[in-house]
Amino acid sequence: MADADSWDADSFEPEEPIKKAAVHDKWEGEDEDDDVKDNWDDDEEEEKEEEEEKKTEAKPTEKKKLSEKIKEKENLQRKKQEELRKQQLEETKRDTPLTPEDELAEKLRVKQLQEDSDLELAKEAFGVVSNNVTGIDAVSPSSKDDFTEFERLLKEKISPYEKSIHYSGFLETLFRDLCLSLEVEDLKKINNSLTVLLSEKQRQEKANKGKKKKKGVLPGGGLKAKMKDDLADYGGFDGGYAQDYEDFM
């Protein structure tokens, strides 16, 4: 048994361990993909950080832009108000001088207009929508009565400016533009209405001129009688110039 054991010991050669194929958890090239993905993730994080920084920088600039827009609107509104006030002052100078009461009323009216415009500007800047619409802006005519009320409000709105030198040109342009969409028959009606108004105005003007002329004209026969009286004064006796004048006549 000892020999067998020694033989076994001499002839025994330890088997080389079978090299197992290297176990790869990942396919070839996946490690590289992971590296690329890691790089992508890093890039995305950097981009997000940059976007956040841009947003934080953009917020104050947006606020600045909004404040600038508000200032621009305020300046524009003030310019319009100043131009309107100058125009009203010029028109007032051309017209009959105002009484102290009229001047005070005009100042109050201009002040009210300025306050209203400032209020509307503030509402627009803060996004406030006013539902308390009144007057002509609240009218949406559909029936005949609605248009009658609309007509009254329009006249009240426009009539205060009838003394302006620009009033007639304003009406001419306004009527022309408003009548562009009308049919021929409707235009004829408007034309006839204005023609009647023109004839009535011309008749009144002639009547007024006739009254002025009559004040300087003597009644019928007055000139002849006056000439006879003058000749009689110069004749001084019966059968003088007055008689000659009668014979001549």
Curated annotation (Swiss-Prot):
Entry keyword Ubl conjugation: no
Transmembrane regions listed in the UniProt entry: none
One annotated GO biological process: formation of cytoplasmic translation initiation complex
Stretches with biased composition (Acidic residues): 1-15, 28-52
Keywords in alphabetical order: Coiled coil, Cytoplasm, Initiation factor, Phosphoprotein, Protein biosynthesis
GO molecular function: translation initiation factor activity
Pfam families per record: eIF3_subunit
Compartment(s) where it occurs, according to its Swiss-Prot or TrEMBL record: Cytoplasm
Entry superkingdom: Eukaryota
Skewed-composition ranges (Basic and acidic residues): 16-27, 53-96
Keyword Phosphoprotein: yes
Residues in coiled coil: 34-96
InterPro entries reported in the protein's UniProt record: eIF3-like_dom_sf, eIF3j
Cystine crosslinks: none
Entry's family note: Belongs to the eIF-3 subunit J family.
Assembly and interaction partners: Component of the eukaryotic translation initiation factor 3 (eIF-3) complex, which is composed of 13 subunits: eif3a, eif3b, eif3c, eif3d, eif3e, eif3f, eif3g, eif3h, eif3i, eif3j, eif3k, eif3l and eif3m.
PANTHER family: EUKARYOTIC TRANSLATION INITIATION FACTOR 3 SUBUNIT J
Functional description taken from the UniProt entry: Component of the eukaryotic translation initiation factor 3 (eIF-3) complex, which is involved in protein synthesis of a specialized repertoire of mRNAs and, together with other initiation factors, stimulates binding of mRNA and methionyl-tRNAi to the 40S ribosome. The eIF-3 complex specifically targets and initiates translation of a subset of mRNAs involved in cell proliferation.
Name of the molecule in the record: Eukaryotic translation initiation factor 3 subunit J-A
